[in-house]
Amino acid sequence: MEFVVFEPGEKYQRKNRKWQGIPGIERTPDGILWVTWYSGGHGEGPDNYVIVVCSKDGGKTWSKPLLAIDPPDDIRAFDPCLWVSPDGKLHLFWSMSKNWWDGIGGVWTMVAEKNIQGDLVWSKPSRIADGIMMNKP
């Protein structure tokens, strides 16, 4: 299932988002602020996706969306959370479920690490648990 968008286009830009919910924020050891939330559609439902942006100047300015989690069909992505683990890695968690809640939805994660060139590289997404998670581990 391909649902990670590494170069979010027009659909994910501010002018096309009617609402935003469940924000999360984290600061990585290099001082960068990372923010996530979910949006899409006219409220909770199958058009929901997760967005990630960052600020390198303490929150004065923000990047365009750097990453979107946008599942296909009637599966929604929601309730994202960011966490920096003790080893300094940035983790993104989110839930996915069919429509509102299908009883078998789950929590997913991706981990970002800097490569040898200093660029941030995200791992492949993986499902880690059943249910929903709205707080840091």
Give the location of each predicted region.
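Asp-box/BNR beta-propeller blade signature and adjacent active/binding-site loops
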Residues: 1-137
